[in-house]
């Protein structure tokens, strides 16, 4: 049985043989390092804005070229004098350039979407890593983003993080300049930026040793954890973070690392079409108020379609100046004609509205003036009623031979008819004029209409058709 001294000796040996607790690898990121990483991430997110701006500009210019080609033709053929060959070829060049650009639109949009997707995805990886480090903070002795003048880092210290402690969202804005991915990428390892904090602060997120990191406690080996899609690889030895732990270190450019696909896609926005792009830029200058004084343009043989043109053609500087003058004059007149046309349309619309109002008023008058043929006779009000229910003021009672009493109208009341409406003759019994007539007699009478098996008054139908025809005519 071992003695107490032997036990003490064994315990001491075990302690001495255990590796010393590493400290340097728990030194957190500095504010400057986090800021440089966020600067790169923000530039990646700007790719979406740049792509959207370029696509919009490309499509707008392509549409302008189509309008320009049409206006060129109108200006040189509808004006005075015969156009020069150079002016005609300038119009053809505008149309061809538009067609060439339209053929590339699908490629442009696809490339813009690819660049936006790749770069935004990688920005998300980076910002998620920074956000985890930002949240891993308990007190002045435990933080993973260290600020030298005060331990309590704030959202304002980390450009990726908003005031609420969350991550900033991507917003699409107008951006004409290409994002500077490479310079932001290399800035991460510039100077002392990539180095860990001077004090320990106990950040185990940057410790890859399984005995020192609770997240790796079940591992049997040390692991070089990678953060931000490989942007940062944590040390596993007793060393602090330095430039060697960051991916941009010893890289010539962003094209050599994990972000090369994003950078390559960005280079294709917009697609490189030097000929069409240069021609478009040149021709669109002719829309300026003042003569742009363009230099001559050479149209090479067979450069348009097939074997056209059959020889080289020059559009001289004089041709461009003449075309600019004719285009300006045509558009000025065209604008004036457009104003006159708009004025005429407004006047026509005003008259139409007046006609509509008149037709509606006329229709209302016709509708209110229609006679009602709803007949109320004394027999309808009294026939079949018992003696006690017969109105005494307008009717009398008579006893039949069989002893039954009936309600009968007074003398002269049988043919009374209530009519409504305005106008002379509204109270006439129009329905009575047609009622009972046979079909041959009914069809000959202008005020009657044979309908089914009955002869009816047609005045109501005529009035309605007249009103509808007036309203329809007013709105045509």
Swiss-Prot record:
It is a lipid-anchor; GPI-anchor. Keywords: Cell membrane, Disulfide bond, Glycoprotein, GPI-anchor, Lipoprotein, Membrane, Signal, Trypanosomiasis. Residues 458-476 form a propeptide. InterPro entries: Trypano_VSG_A_N_dom (IPR001812), Variant_surf_glycoprt_trypan_C (IPR019609). GO terms for cellular component: plasma membrane; side of membrane. Its main location: membrane. This is Variant surface glycoprotein 4. It comes from Trypanosoma brucei rhodesiense.
